[in-house]
């Protein structure tokens, strides 16, 4: 199937005369050793799209935010249909996923699910020039998160120097996330690994992306062989008895009338996770590993989508290829 990409027209803008950019270039020159001539070349022609999307704060971030009826159905639909592609991806890169799972203790299906949600297994990595987008977000229109995006721009330039790549050629999402794992530059710098041992950490390389995701989860507290979440029973159709979301935790013995639907291999405090469907609320327990997934994206719905997609991928894989 032919895939046609219609890109927004780009105009080249000179940022070198902006006061804040001049200060930024001086910082990069004196603190990090970048050449003045090189910096001026990069900032002289910043490609700017007239149709680039505004960066909005996610509505599903945090643990205690209220959702609307049916919000889980709408949110999950776009991701849970990717199980077939996930089982194929897991089969194709089985040896690499197995090696990452053994080294970091993260199940193969969870690594695969994150790649599936973040980039649809590499198909949707983003087609924006990351340097240009971060420059725009850092220095235009008094963006409320300008300071954050400047730290990302610094990280991008430093990692491009370390990996010996041209920062002007790196493509990613409209907010600067890169590769199959959709790491922002600071995350890339902190958690990317050279999993194929070629001397480079490349997020557009499948092997490095797989290893880096597993490494990220491990460093954020993933516990091997510990269950992530389980569906629970409760009385009624809508649950409002207690605060829900990953930021609230409870001892299970204090949650009267709430029972797991199946065995849950986790003994610590749990979160109550409410998924608002059209006609009722699904309620789940979430353990420490569920919380770890929210470190990748601070949304209970995101982490639950990862968990449920991982389980669907595991079942699809067993059906198509047999058990691992």
Question: How should these model regions be labeled?
Answer:
Residues 1-171, 186-324:
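Cell-wall glycan-active module
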Residues 172-186:
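Extracytoplasmic ligand-binding site segments that recognize negatively charged/polar headgroups
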């Amino acid at each position: 199937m032919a895939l046609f990409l219609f890109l927004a027209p780009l105009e080249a803008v000179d940022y070198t005369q902006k006061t804040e950019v001049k200060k930024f270039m001086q910082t990069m020159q004196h603190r990090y050793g970048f050449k003045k001539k090189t910096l001026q070349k990069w900032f002289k022609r910043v490609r700017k799209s007239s149709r680039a999307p505004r960066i909005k704060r996610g509505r599903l971030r945090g643990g205690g935010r209220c959702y609307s009826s049916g919000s889980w159905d709408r949110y999950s639909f776009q991701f849970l249909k990717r199980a077939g592609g996930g089982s194929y991806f897991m089969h194709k890169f089985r040896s690499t996923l197995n090696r990452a799972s053994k080294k970091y203790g993260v199940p193969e299906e969870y690594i695969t699910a994150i790649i599936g949600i973040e980039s649809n297994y590499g198909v949707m990595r983003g087609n924006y020039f990351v340097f240009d987008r971060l420059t725009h977000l850092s220095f235009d229109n008094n963006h409320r998160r300008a300071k954050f995006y400047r730290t990302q721009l610094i990280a991008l330039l430093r990692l491009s120097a370390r990996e010996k790549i041209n920062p002007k050629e790196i493509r990613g999402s409209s907010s600067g996330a890169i590769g199959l794992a959709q790491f922002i530059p600071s995350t890339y710098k902190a958690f990317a690994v050279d999993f194929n041992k070629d001397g480079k950490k490349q997020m557009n390389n499948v092997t490095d992306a797989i290893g880096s995701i597993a490494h990220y989860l491990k460093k954020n507290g993933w516990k091997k062989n510990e269950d992530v979440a389980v569906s629970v029973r409760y009385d009624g159709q809508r649950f409002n008895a207690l605060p829900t979301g990953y930021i609230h935790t409870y001892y299970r013995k204090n949650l009267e009338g709430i029972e797991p639907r199946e065995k849950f291999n986790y003994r610590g405090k749990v979160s109550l996770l409410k998924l608002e469907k059209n006609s009722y609320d699904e309620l789940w327990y979430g353990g420490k590993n569920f919380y770890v997934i929210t470190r990748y994206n601070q949304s209970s719905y995101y982490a639950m989508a990862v968990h449920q997609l991982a389980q669907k991928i595991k079942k699809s894989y067993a059906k198509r290829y047999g058990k691992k």
